Amino acid sequence: MFQQLSARLQEAIGRLRGRGRITEEDLKATLREIRRALMDADVNLEVARDFVERVREEALGKQVLESLTPAEVILATVYEALKEALGGEARLPVLKDRNLWFLVGLQGSGKTTTAAKLALYYKGKGRRPLLVAADTQRPAAREQLRLLGEKVGVPVLEVMDGESPESIRRRVEEKARLEARDLILVDTAGRLQIDEPLMGELARLKEVLGPDEVLLVLDAMTGQEALSVARAFDEKVGVTGLVLTKLDGDARGGAALSARHVTGKPIYFAGVSEKPEGLEPFYPERLAGRILGMGDVASLAEKVRAAGLEAEAPKSAKELSLEDFLKQMQNLKRLGPFSEILGLLPGVPQGLKVDEKAIKRLEAIVLSMTPEERKDPRILNGSRRKRIAKGSGTSVQEVNRFIKAFEEMKALMKSLEKKKGRGLMGMFRR
């Protein structure tokens, strides 16, 4: 997500790079480009107008017209405005000894999947979640949550057709007490569109169960429609926080930039993949940095630590072998798709595609070598390279290009040797 917006904002700011002082007309032109980029990304009109006005006022306050580095001033100002539009500081629901949360939203928003993802997330934090399939009209919705609960290893309480809120409350309380469950996640009824029966059912269930949080799940790919949904749910039911799903999609991102402003509610979580673990706390400052090409090294460092890679000592360029290269490649695969990882690095465009098949071919080349060949590529004569190409399903030319690239990489590493980190993993060692 945000590839188009990211490219447009970086292009608008980039036009000021390398220039000395700029004129007021230059600033106006840059702000016009920023406004167009926001509107094309389906950002709410009021949000876009307020955003540009804030950037203009703060840039002038920082005397951008007198600055010798106007691009840096505008970049910093846009970053702060983006961060605030997305919610400012990161926030999560406050946990108590016992917690009961509602998940509300339309069908297709990812609400039921999000319930299971939340259960898995908090299970990993030491909580004992219980999922409640509370759609009294659609047995298929209850079955979906039951299957997801089995997948993430969390029990599911299914309501019965037409069951009253009072009965649901009694059964939920009893099961939570008997099994010592301290986080109850209620997947409420979903509909294809907002209607009075749906809202009435939700309001009645809320009145009886008394949830601590009401989390509205919004599909970030639905654009301005998501904002209408958010307003309706907040007015009729009362929303305490938002979860944005499908942030890994190709949508323009307007909902993410507008939802907090329109509802006044914090964005707690973001769905970043379809996998059960594909739910992350929402960090406004990190997303703002990614959009502006500033990277998100904090998220990358977390992935490295979660994969247990930070304790592995990096080797010097002189010691680095193809065996080490293979190990690093396999380590990076544990962090996630290469395109996703590269997108977290400063200066790498959002949406950059990496040929994963080509990566697998490189891995196959190294795996087709003997331990001696991986240790010392200098012994790779013509016949050895031919054997490796055959064993890896590649060509001799591909093997030759790979060996040459590896040697060039070692030469580059030698020139960086005096810097603190060695290689990607070295960036995150404490």
Swiss-Prot record:
Annotated keywords: Cytoplasm, GTP-binding, Hydrolase, Nucleotide-binding, Ribonucleoprotein, RNA-binding, Signal recognition particle
Catalytic reaction list: GTP + H2O = GDP + phosphate + H(+)
Binding site for GTP: 105-112, 187-191, 245-248
Similarity field: Belongs to the GTP-binding SRP family. SRP54 subfamily.
PANTHER family per record: SIGNAL RECOGNITION PARTICLE 54K PROTEIN SRP54, SIGNAL RECOGNITION PARTICLE SUBUNIT SRP54
Top-level enzyme category: hydrolase
InterPro entries assigned: AAA+_ATPase, P-loop_NTPase, Signal_recog_part_SRP54_M_sf, Signal_recog_particl_SRP54_hlx, Signal_recog_particle_SRP54_M, SRP, SRP/SRP_N, SRP54
Pfam family, one: SRP54
Localization (cell): Cytoplasm
Superkingdom as given in the UniProt entry: Bacteria
Known role: Involved in targeting and insertion of nascent membrane proteins into the cytoplasmic membrane. Binds to the hydrophobic signal sequence of the ribosome-nascent chain (RNC) as it emerges from the ribosomes. The SRP-RNC complex is then targeted to the cytoplasmic membrane where it interacts with the SRP receptor FtsY.
Name of the protein: Signal recognition particle protein
The organism of origin for this protein: Thermus aquaticus
